Amino acid sequence: MSFASEFKAFALKGNVVDLAVGVIIGAAFGKIVDSIVNDLVMPVVGAIFGGFDFKDYFVALKEIPPGVPHALDAVKKAGVPVFAYGSFLTIVLNFLILAFIIFLMVKQFNRMKRAEPAPAPAAPPEQVVLLREIRDALRR
């Protein structure tokens, strides 16, 4: 078998295609979760903790030059090293929301799998039934 045909057989297996579809859908779903966190959750958290965007919380590790606004992007542009804990907390919140949603999806999927009753066993062929009757008759 040639290298190209081996690769084609590998790449077109159902598992590889399913994995590719899952990665693509996961990336799109990640963008939805990012939007939920950045556009819906974090503004509320920011309003509770001081009125500005939570992802702009940082600690400058050097003195901020005079005239530079105290915003994360401006401080980074000025070359000041920062400890951007607000961005980190936003990403952690993204992860927790995504993990919770995936947990709910898996839980629902497992519930649906359990809800389906097991199929009744198929009746044995007539030959098997006849052989069992003969066996039982010989035992007597």
Swiss-Prot record:
Q: What is this protein's function? A: Channel that opens in response to stretch forces in the membrane lipid bilayer. May participate in the regulation of osmotic pressure changes within the cell.
What protein name is recorded for this chain? Large-conductance mechanosensitive channel
Originating gene: mscL
**Could you tell me which PROSITE patterns the record lists for this protein?**
MSCL (PS01327)
- Alphabetical keyword list: Cell inner membrane, Cell membrane, Ion channel, Ion transport, Membrane, Transmembrane, Transmembrane helix, Transport
Query: Topology in the membrane?
Result: Multi-pass membrane protein
Q: Subunit structure, per the record?
A: Homopentamer.
Annotated transmembrane regions:
9-29, 86-106
Quote the NCBIfam families the UniProt record gives: mscL (TIGR00220), PRK00567.1-4 (NF001843), PRK13952.1 (NF010557)
Q: Which cysteines are joined by disulfide bonds?
A: none
SUPFAM superfamilies listed in its UniProt record: Gated mechanosensitive channel
Q: Where in the cell is it found?
A: Cell inner membrane
Q: Which GO terms describe its cellular component?
A: plasma membrane
Task: Kindly list the GO molecular function terms attached to this UniProt entry.
Answer: mechanosensitive monoatomic ion channel activity
Instruction: Please give the InterPro entries that the UniProt record associates with this protein.
Output: Mechanosensitive_channel_CS (IPR019823), MS_channel (IPR001185), MSC/AndL (IPR037673), MscL_channel (IPR036019)
Regarding protein family, the annotation reads: Belongs to the MscL family.
Instruction: Tell me the domain of life.
Output: Bacteria
Q: For this UniProt entry, what is the primary localization, expressed as one broad class?
A: membrane
